[in-house]
Amino acid sequence: MKIMKRVIVALLVAAMAVSVFAACGKGGSGSGVVTLNVFSQRANFEGMQGGWMAAILKDRFGVELNIVKESGNTLTTRMEAGDLGDIVIWGTDGEDYKAAVDAGLLLDWEEQGLLKDYGTYMYEHMQSALEKNRRVSGDGKIHGIGNGIAAEDESGKEQHQEFMYAWELRYDYYVELGCPEVKDLDDLFDVFVQMKENHPTDDEGKETYAVSIWPDWDGNMVMYPKSLASAYYGIDEFALGFYDFTTNEFIDPLRINDDGSYGPYLEMVQYFNRLYRAGLLDPDSDIQKNDQASAKVKSGRTFWSIFNYAGSAQFNSLENLNSGKGMYTVVPEEATPVVYGLSPLGGSSLWTIGSKTKEPELCMQVINWFATPTGNLEQQYGPQGLCWYYDENGKTCFTDLGRTATADQNTELVSDNPDYQKYCGDTFKNGMQQLNNIVWSLDAINPDSGETFNKKGWASEKTPLAEGNIELVWRENNNSNSMDEYLDARGKFVISQKYSYAEGKKDADLKVVWEQVTKSITTWSWKAIEADTEEEFENAINEMLKEAKSYNNGEGYNQCVEWSENEAAILTDIIKEAKSAQN
């Protein structure tokens, strides 16, 4: 194996040279560029990583990344061939990952010092996350590391990530209406109606909607109704349904309450149907992709987003903000959003290395670099020096180009400095990391600066706003300097913290039934959302209930729910054990 050869060579090299090589030296064969094939279950892109990120990786390691996203039977085909790729990124540390471990398709990171010698930053600073993977893997070995990791000393009870469920609304339109009270979803609906009456089209004359959604991120349920349930009731998606971290209860998606009312998921499917029938839901929602929906948000064709990444992150450009436009938090009084906890254990989206790779050390070096503070900042905000830097106090600051590029990702990177020419010539967007996974949590504390990796936590970003910026009005009305500060101070939220839980395996029969049931749920949910009448909606819901419960002699849905309830019981035990250890 190539590892042994390099270890022997390393023993003959001076200690300082070995250290430098392990930390940041180039890998690969001689001066040539090595192509690493990265199979990612999370990627939305397929092809060669390009732009400034490609230049960074080529300069540091002499590598280029060929990204293969999961689609159709891609994973099955690769599993059957016995070769998953060089670097393998998993959506979760559940069934697919464990099957790959059992099949011997993933490297043992501790074999012949691979982690210790070539993953030095992770080895020295992320032991909790590595040990979590050892427990999850089931064979006592470390095969990878998760995402969203926080530093070892910042996982106290009150620590959480940025609020993803931010309840963002076109605040300029909201102020125009006189900032009416929004107590519940009915009040929010009324606000949407008034906004559309006042602004039926965007600046280009195209029709506006309350929201534009997309189906390509659907899973066991349709994503947007599922997410609205999480944003409103403080329950988090779990197996086939939701987990309530307040009551430790599992809630199945097709629940109908004793009084005949719908459970959380069906209630939100009904809400989206209400939007659809009122002309407030983009009619292309069932056929478009995420990037098409994002383009509509950017152009001002939507009023509302559950998510920060699909609202303010898209619309709040400097130009819009300084023109008095912007999306900001207006959360219904009755809403209790879920927010995700920070933990040194990290999340479940794993970085691993395929067992058939010919470049194990190089793969480890690349993953390790992504895990360093510099690597994390560069993949978020661009090349150090060109886009950001540390000031004399060690605090993170944007360059003028970096600030502009992060606000408008279509900004072309340019520089007169010859050291930065290799990163220039294309837009910031075209160089962004396309693997769709990061090792650190964006909201973790950067040990090199003492601030968060998230630019919202930088002292340098807390600058006075320009006159006319709509955020000034929002801040004054909400007595807060940021949306996260407001949501924290509001105090109504639930932290989702799953600790070392990893989803269990399903047997072959359950896998078949699970796929049938979830397909029924998503298919009929969309039909219900786009029903033209109340009668059509009720028929679609009834068909969903009937079909989902028809499989395996009428026991299929119940089997999926029973399996999910057993998993919820395991999670409950893990949570109780973790909290007991903290006290």
Language model: regions and residue ranges:
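Terminal recognition/anchoring or ligand-binding modules at protein termini
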Residues: 17
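Extracytoplasmic/secretory soluble proteins
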Residues: 2-3, 12, 20, 24-583
